[in-house]
A protein has these predicted regions:
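C-terminal outer-membrane/trafficking sorting elements
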Residues: 361-405
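Catalytic His-Asp segment of secreted/periplasmic serine-dependent ester chemistry enzymes
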Residues: 244, 280-361
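Trp- and acidic/polar-enriched beta-sheet ligand-binding modules for extracellular glycan
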Residues: 31-32, 77-81, 88-159
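Serine-esterase "nucleophile elbow" of acetyl-processing enzymes
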Residues: 136-208, 222-231
Length: 405
């Protein structure tokens, strides 16, 4: 249990992001009992750096009481997060039914005693993360009876104090191609860029782009989205291209209603939404441009719902069409369109981390000379309690910033 003394007007600090250290970065992954690979823990999603396996183990070491285990798959050429788009079918993930095991005494990742910490059944997505109890353990292992496909990355984060630095990037083929980091092996992801600017933070980020998908598809599959990624703290949303395809406004009202439904569902799960402005096409190649009414609707939704403002993909790609492919719509890997998307996302969400970093520094200074005139913020595991100088509890918040009753 930790105590911080804060002035009363700083109570909003209860909503700050809590760092969840990446424990697996650079660790060796042991594959199928007799192989090892640094591909799976290098932070890169470059498509050729994968391992086909149904048994992956990582030595994390002792310390954390709880960890967030995430994985990214390639699925034999498929980059789409799920087969949820009515307009076009996608390659389904092979990693459907599997278990996550933990061990305290393994020496190789395959010997020793193992406990089943989490079981996943009927999984439909290529990227996902789950919270796992890790008290007294030192090894993590993913085990599937069937072929699991191609692992791009396996990451393990320390969430002993909460898991609210966790992100899901919901999007279209623009995100499927851009956020999947296909530009080159040197492309820096949004998570890498945030870590460079704010070294205390190593965000857990799941990529969720689906080609051909529109907001109606997402609303129709909201139960599946919430089952797979309802446990993260932020949904970073890139949508609108397929809803506004062709440049007309015939689908505008449906788009707005669908986005509001998605926002409401996220909020009901304690998820904060960051909404990007829809990407501009290169109209000389695509033959159309997004109607400005879509942008106005997105701006209104951000204001009305109190959302975080995401990147302005429209303004950037309107000014820099050279980052788009020959179809005039998708980020061009050869010219760095994907890298630009990662940079724009990092720039958009950096203020969230800047506010947190500033608050923590300020509060540490004040805590060192605390006086009875200051309120107390009590951090106990994943919850935060604010108390007045008289000891009265003002409010309790969980690690996601939600009121804890």
């Amino acid at each position: 249990m930790k105590f911080l003394a804060l002035p009363l007007f700083c109570a909003a600090w209860a909503f700050a992001i809590l760092p969840n250290e990446n424990l697996s970065q650079g660790k060796m992954a042991y594959v199928d009992g007799n192989d090892s690979s640094a591909y799976l823990t290098d932070g890169s999603l470059t498509n050729w750096k994968y391992k086909e396996s149904k048994n992956v183990a990582l030595h994390i070491g002792e310390g954390p009481s709880k960890v967030f285990v995430s994985w990214e798959l390639y699925s034999f050429g498929g980059i789409d997060w799920a087969d949820f788009a009515l307009a076009c079918p996608h390659t389904k993930t092979l990693l459907t039914d599997f278990a996550i095991l933990t061990s305290a005494n393994s020496t190789t990742g395959f010997d020793g005693d193992w406990d089943t910490a989490y079981v996943v059944t009927q999984n439909q997505v290529l990227a996902r993360g789950v919270a796992v109890d890790f008290e007294g353990k030192s090894w993590i292992r993913l085990v599937s009876d069937d072929n699991a496909g191609q692992f791009l990355e396996v990451e393990v984060f320390d969430i002993s104090n909460g898991q609210n630095d966790t992100w899901f990037f919901m999007g279209t083929s623009i995100s499927a191609m851009g956020i999947k980091q296909q530009d080159s092996d040197t492309t820096k992801t949004t998570a890498m860029l945030i870590h460079e600017q704010f070294p205390d933070f190593t965000p857990a980020m799941l990529r969720g782009g689906v080609s051909c998908i529109n907001t109606t598809d997402i609303v129709n599959h909201l139960p599946e989205y919430l089952e797979a990624v309802g446990n993260v703290n932020f949904w970073a949303i890139e949508m609108g291209t397929n809803d506004g395809w062709g440049g007309g406004t015939w689908n505008l009202s449906t788009y707005v209603q669908n986005l509001q439904t998605i926002i409401d569902a996220a909020k009901a799960y304690g998820i904060s939404v960051v909404l990007a402005r829809t990407l501009a096409t290169d109209s000389s190649k695509a033959g159309w441009q997004l109607a400005p009414e879509f942008l106005a609707a997105e701006d209104s939704l951000i204001q009305v719902n109190g959302l975080y403002q995401g990147p302005d993909f429209y303004a950037f790609f309107k000014e820099h069409p050279e980052y788009l492919a020959s179809d005039g719509v998708h980020p061009n890997g050869e010219t760095g369109g994907g890298a630009a998307m990662h940079r724009l996302w990092a720039e958009a969400i950096a203020p969230i981390y800047a506010d947190t970093t500033s608050a923590i520094y300020s509060h540490r200074k004040r805590a060192s000379s605390a006086s009875p005139s200051l309120v107390k913020v009590i951090v106990n595991g994943g919850s935060v309690e604010i108390r007045t100088p008289k000891g009265n509890s003002v409010q309790n918040f969980d690690a996601k910033g939600r009121i804890a009753h």
